[in-house]
Design a protein with these regions (language model features):
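Helical segment within the ABC ATPase nucleotide-binding domain
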Residues: 59-71
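A short, surface-exposed alpha-helical micro-motif characterized by mixed small hydrophobic
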Residues: 86-88
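Conserved ABC ATPase signature
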Residues: 19-23
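Conserved ABC ATPase "signature" region
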Residues: 1-15, 63-66
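H-loop/switch region of ABC-family ATPase nucleotide-binding domains
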Residues: 80-81
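Catalytic Walker B motif of ABC-type/P-loop ATPase nucleotide-binding domains
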Residues: 44-47
Length: 139
């Protein structure tokens, strides 16, 4: 009964009876969310839910996460590198580096935070912009 409820809630009834090897990576992620519903876990940890998932299924997974949060009260803690996906689902966003909180805020605040840019993109990007400004100033 709980399995059927999860399949219906996630609109994946068509996957009932399929073996794990017969479904795509994104469909497996949806089945994992259904399994979470079966044990009624209220805090769910997700690791790279978007890895290897096409954009259409990622949107479906995002919709399912939002519904589980709003309609069932689930809380999600995610490790994810797709900031567009995170920005759609999470507020606040917390970025960690070397085991410490580096920044906290909205996705747009995080994406423009100098510390985050330096930690994850390196100083090369900032130096490139500075060198471009210097080249333009001396011309």
């Amino acid at each position: 009964a709980k399995a059927d409820e999860g399949l219906e809630f996630l609109s994946i009834e068509h996957l009932a009876g399929h073996k794990a090897g017969q479904v795509s990576g994104g469909q497996k992620k949806l089945l994992e969310l259904g399994r979470t519903m079966m044990v009624d876990a209220r805090i769910v940890f997700l690791d790279e839910v978007g890895a290897g998932v096409n954009r259409t299924l990622l949107n479906t997974i995002g919709d399912a996460i939002l519904r589980l949060n709003k309609e069932r009260g689930y809380t999600f803690c995610m490790i994810e590198h797709d900031m567009d996906f995170i920005g759609r689902l999470c507020d606040p966003v917390i970025v960690m580096a070397e085991g410490k909180v580096l920044a906290e805020g909205s996705a747009s605040q995080i994406m423009s935070d100098e510390r985050v840019i330096e930690a994850y993109l390196g100083t090369g990007l900032k130096n490139k912009d500075k060198n471009k400004d210097k080249a333009g100033a001396s011309a």
